[in-house]
Amino acid sequence: MALAREKRAEFSAQKLEPIFEKYPSVKVRWYDVEAFSTKASDIAVFETTSLQDYYFVIDAIRDSEFCTVPYFEFVEIIPAIEDGYVEYES
């Protein structure tokens, strides 16, 4: 964790929230995994109806201090479709 705990909320409000506000079709949920994994400390789950907006969000995050300082590193991006097999079989 590169930022002190008290600075994380401030950083999120100033640097990340404007990105998410610009692309309201992209929702993000954060999960702490450091007690369960040595590969990553956090997981972000993005949900969207617009693949283009998702792409723009990821590019904006990568261009921000979040990744350029870096405070955070993308370890892996795993795209998925919820219940994709159900839709395929219908």
Swiss-Prot record:
Q: Which InterPro entries match?
A: Darcynin
Q: What name is this protein filed under?
A: Darcynin 1
Stated family: Belongs to the darcynin family.
Q: Which domain of life is it from?
A: Bacteria
